[in-house]
Amino acid sequence: MLTKDEIGKILVEACSTGADFAELYFEDTTVSNVRIIQDKVDESSATNLYGCGLRVLKDMEEAYGYTNDTSFDGLWQLAQNLKQNYHSKPLISAVSFQEQQRTDHTTFGSLAVDYDQLCATLKQIAKTILAYDSRMIQAAATYQGQLQKITVCNTNGVFANDTRFIQRIAAQAVSKDENSMQSGFDSYGGNFDFKALMDYDYDEFAKKIAQTAITMLTAKEMKGGVYDVVIHNAFGGVIFHEACGHSLEATSVAKKLSFFSDKLGEKIASDVVTAIDDGTIANEWGSQNIDDEGNPQQKRVLIENGILKSYMIDMRNARRMKMPSTGSGRRQSYRFSPTSRMSNTYIANGSSTFEEIIQNTKYGLFAKSMGGGSVNPATGEYNFSVSEGYLIEDGKITEPVRGATLIGNGKDTLLKIDMVADNLSLGYGMCGSLSGSIPACVGQPTIRVKAMTVGGKGE
């Protein structure tokens, strides 16, 4: 690692032709993957990513480059290359780094992984799935771990370090009978140490996944139509994340490409909806101590009782919007320039209970587990598959259904949410956008959406 004096010289040199801001992002990341299929290790790998990205700004104009030569000479040459984009007098002659005050939200007892214990746990998950029912034909369990150490330095005086240790265990079950083949999936993870990852009930985890795969074998095809839809907690929040969350990022808001642009203070959701993006939840999957621009992470209230309160803003788009950064600048690695991204994004708890929502639904669909989907970011129109669904009849959950697809528009859906339960839970995923693929939580309590379009092939 270079000295602060050397880093300061490189930043000043990058700004020597008129740029008004420069930033260095150093990264050392190790990624580990283990996959068990049935009772065999199918994959075990480890890779290392090491390098530095240099970003230079003049007003909104950005130049970005990266290298894995992090010596003074290597980064000096990178600064020489990027400064060719500008042709005016220097505005910055020196950099004085400041001590940063912050609160750490992710802490680790150890950065070690016991791979013998890990493989034994993954094999036991697969074994439990296969033993659940004779119709189970395949079980897979995987581990993904990423130990990332970063340093961010810029001409504003920021010199900040962070260590992230995201780990996740996921499993999939495949069942088959004479009529169809079905599957179940779930995952558990966080930004925490290996002991915390192991302190989880993986026996119950495996049984729930297997139960979904078996239940869906006897499910009938969903009949398309308009229904009141009860969307369960945790990964049910993927609809808000995809259809609304991305439209609240400054990446689209700043350029007036979002239907939420210029809507601060306006009603955009029903009164029962409060939505939050919180990068400070202790040791959560999408949490950080600092964002990837060196700013302390924050809890951002996006929507409060239906009123739009805030956007997620990175430093560059803050210039265009003339608003402060909200600590939302994130990137996959040093090979990507940062932009505004979500962290742990969820609809907050409401005043109803799960039981009350079901009891107050005369006829509808209970979407217990969500699958994949697609969203048009310009309009917010979406469709998402329901991986585990049930009919609701006379206030009771009855028979299972499969093949249901939820179809709607993000801004319309927000206004049609009329009940929110008190059982908030989060789900774990990887989110892709301009600055690459990053860990992000989605989440919500159980919610009810009135008069929702549901696709299906049933009769």
What annotation goes with each model-predicted range?
Residues 1-459:
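N-terminal small-residue-enriched
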